[in-house]
Amino acid sequence: MAHPVQLGLQDATSPVMEELVTFHDHALMAMFLISFLILYALSATLTTKLTNTNITDAQEMETIWTILPAVILVLIALPSLRILYMTDEINNPSFTIKSIGHQWYWTYEYTDYGGLIFNSYMLPPLFLNPGDLRLLEVDNRVVLPIEAPVRMMITSQDVLHSWTIPTLGLKTDAVPGRLNQTVFTATRPGVYYGQCSEICGANHSFMPIVAELIPLKIFEMGPVFTL
């Protein structure tokens, strides 16, 4: 999860998030290259004493500043498209869990376990235990397995919401009347936090998401819920 004064991204807990972190570094290198070239051109223009008022065109320079940006855009677009198709790929998920957004809480339905349904509300400050995170703890966590592809089917009962867990690289809009889906595979156990990432009304800031990831063997014994 995020920490105070954190400058980097959260630690990746899924292959997709690992790819996103790598792509972030890749795009940042391209940005540094562009910034360096622009700053160099500006400094050279300001410091040089060489001038020529008879120049009418510069074919070589125009060719360079046309081809170079095109090459940079291709180098950014190719890995971006690869990750885009990776996030949309659905390959025989082991489990399917449905998440329904409401103003202002989440409902989870385990379709593979007899249609078990429960709500997940943010814990008010008066109910927090020492060490709990303010505005991030919930009464019922969604329990998910690691090392197995899990399909999340996400929709909304009222207005637009967005089911987001940054460390898993997940952000899927919950749209009324529409069922969106995303698949992820978590790589290590733990408790991971997210929040609704679509402004959905007065209490938008008070509908957190808490996913408790446990080993697959334990999950297969029967989901463990904090009900």
Swiss-Prot record:
Q: Which residues bind Cu cation A1?
A: 161, 196, 200, 207
User: What InterPro entries would the database entry show?
Assistant: CcO_II, CcO_II-like_C, CcO_II_C, Copper_CuA, Cupredoxin, Cyt_c_oxidase_su2, Cyt_c_oxidase_su2_TM_dom, Cyt_c_oxidase_su2_TM_sf
- Binding-site residues, Mg(2+): 198
Keyword Cytoplasm recorded: no
Main role?
A: Component of the cytochrome c oxidase, the last enzyme in the mitochondrial electron transport chain which drives oxidative phosphorylation. The respiratory chain contains 3 multisubunit complexes succinate dehydrogenase (complex II, CII), ubiquinol-cytochrome c oxidoreductase (cytochrome b-c1 complex, complex III, CIII) and cytochrome c oxidase (complex IV, CIV), that cooperate to transfer electrons derived from NADH and succinate to molecular oxygen, creating an electrochemical gradient over the inner membrane that drives transmembrane transport and the ATP synthase.
Membrane topology (Mitochondrial intermembrane): 1-14, 88-227
Top enzyme class, one word, equals translocase
What is the protein name stated in its UniProt record?
Cytochrome c oxidase subunit 2
Checking NCBIfam families in the record gives: CoxB
GO-annotated biological processes: ATP synthesis coupled electron transport
Catalysis: reaction(s): 4 Fe(II)-[cytochrome c] + O2 + 8 H(+)(in) = 4 Fe(III)-[cytochrome c] + 2 H2O + 4 H(+)(out)
Q: Which residues lie on this side of the membrane: Mitochondrial matrix?
A: 46-59
Name any cofactors this protein relies on: Cu cation
| EC number(s) per entry | 7.1.1.9
Q: Which family does it belong to?
A: Belongs to the cytochrome c oxidase subunit 2 family.
Please give the Gene3D superfamilies that the UniProt record associates with this protein.
Answer: 1.10.287.90, Cupredoxins - blue copper proteins
Q: How is the cofactor bound?
A: Binds a dinuclear copper A center per subunit.
Q: Does the keyword Magnesium apply?
A: yes
